[in-house]
C-alpha cells in the first residue's frame, strides 16, 4: 500500500522529481558503494542526466541536488543554508567529498555532470551515475525519478514491493475504497487510519502528520514574511507578503464576500514562493504542486474550524488515499503526464480532504476528487526558463480555490454524476501519454517558448 508517509514527504524545493528524487538517488549511489566495499577505490564520479531532468535540470537545480546527495545528504535533513557554499567549493576545486566526508574524488563539474536531451528507455526522468577507479568502471547505476520524490533503479522499475505488508482494507481503485466503506460503515479517513496502523504505530503516524503540518505552516509563515525577488534569471517578485499586508489592513473593514479567495491565494502563493526559493516544503504530492493542500487546510483552519490532531489526520489521510490512486493507476510526474499529474492531482486530493472535513460521505469525497481533476484534464507543464515559478506559483493558487469549489459542488449535488473518479484517473493518464512531449516538463513548448528570461 502507498502510505501517507510516501505521499507526504518533507524535502526541499524547487522540484520533487528534479530535486528531491535526484538527491535521494545520489545518496543511494554512495550507500551502494559503501555496502559493496567500493567507496575507497573510487577516484571519480560521472553523472549523466537525461530527458526532462536534463532539459529543465538547471532551472530545477537537478545538478546541485545530485551533488548534495553524493555528498551524503537527504532532502528532509539537508542544511539548506549550507548548499550554496558547498557547491561553490566543488565548482572551484573540482573535488567532491562523498558520503559525509568519508572519501574524496575528482569532480570537475564541466566534465562530470553531463546533460542529454534524449530520454532513457523507461521514463522521461532518467539519470546514470558511474563510479570509476582511474579509467575502470567499478560501479554504475541508472535511476528514474518517477514523480513526487519517488525514485527507482533500472532493475526494479515497474515492480511491486517484494513483500508488501498486508492491510485490513487493500484497494486499487476508488470503487474498492467506497465498497469497503459501505460494508464497514467507516468513513474514508477511518478506513485509511486502520490501514496506516497496520504499517506504523499510532505514535509514529501522529508524529508524521504533525511534522507535515508544521512544515506546511512554516512554509506559509516564511512565505508571507519574506519580500524580494525569487532566485533565477526570471527575477519573479514575491507576492505573498504584499498580499498579506493588504488583507490584514482591510480584514475588519471589508464587506467583500469574495475576500476569502484572496486568503486562499495568499496561502498557496506563500508556500510555492518558498519552494521556488529552494526552501523546506512537503511533497503534496509533488513540489510543483506543494501549495494547494496546505492552502486549503489553512483556509479551513482560518474560516471554518481550527485544525486539531483529529481534523489534520482526517484531511491528510483522505488526501493521501486519493493521491495513492493516481500514483497506482496513472502518474504524478509532470514529465510523464503534464501538470495535470501535479497540480491536477493536488487539487483532487485537497478537494477530497476538504469534503471529508465538511461532512461528506465516502461517495461525495470521491465526487469532489473527480470534479477537481475533471477540470484540470489536459493541463500542460511548460515551466518558463525551466524554473518552478511561471506559471507554477500562480497555478497553485488557482487550483487551491478550485479545490474548495469542487468540494462544495460535491456536497451540494443531488443528482448522480456521469463520471466516476476511477474513469477520470484513467482519462488523465491517457491524456498525458497522448500529450506532445514539449508540453511535459521540457520547457520546449507553451509559455516556456513565449517568455524571454532576463539575463
From Swiss-Prot:
Keywords: 4Fe-4S, Gluconeogenesis, Iron, Iron-sulfur, Lyase, Metal-binding. It is an enzyme of class 4 (lyase). Coiled coil: none annotated. Its EC number is 4.3.1.17. Its cofactor is [4Fe-4S] cluster. GO terms for biological process: gluconeogenesis; L-serine catabolic process. Activated by post-translational modification by a system involving at least three gene products. Activation is mimicked in vitro by iron and dithiothreitol. There is considerable evidence for a free-radical activation mechanism. Pathway: Carbohydrate biosynthesis; gluconeogenesis. Signal peptide: none annotated. Induction: Transcribed in rich medium, particularly in the absence of glucose, and is under the control of catabolite activator protein. It is made aerobically and anaerobically. Repressed by LeuO. Part of the sdaCB operon. Binds 1 [4Fe-4S] cluster. SUPFAM superfamilies: Serine metabolism enzymes domain. It catalyses: L-serine = pyruvate + NH4(+). InterPro entries: ASB_dom_sf, Fe-S_L-Ser, Fe-S_L-Ser_mono, Ser_deHydtase-like_asu, Ser_deHydtase_bsu. Transmembrane segments: none annotated. GO terms for molecular function: 4 iron, 4 sulfur cluster binding; L-serine ammonia-lyase activity; metal ion binding. Belongs to the iron-sulfur dependent L-serine dehydratase family. Also deaminates threonine, particularly when it is present in high concentration. This is L-serine dehydratase 2.
